[in-house]
Amino acid sequence: MNGLEEVKEVVIIGDGAKWVWNIAEELFPDAVFILDYYHFSEHVHECAEVIYPEDEVNRRRWIDSIIEGFMNGRIEETLSVIDPDAYEDEKASKKVAELKNYLESNKDKVRYKEYRDRGYFI
């Protein structure tokens, strides 16, 4: 007996690496999976640095709008404004596409409003 049968709920926080989720899902199929806020935020900040390398005001505004959207449960709406085609600069467009892919592939793990409402650490 390892004590897991007494646990009401298992919550796993990870960085978004597919191998982490694969192992976690295999071992704990009924767990709640959360993309940790640090890595979520890090990806958003890195993307904003490429979009607005010289414009701190718009960079901060963009970061805040993306993070606020996810934190307030507006996941689909926020994902829709992360649009690679909105950027003429190839490097910016590529970075936005990478961010969108990262967030879409972890969409079921970024329900931060729900997690905070349930008292989970993110």
Task: Label the model's feature ranges.
Residues 1-122:
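Catalytic center-proximal scaffold of phosphoryl-transfer enzymes
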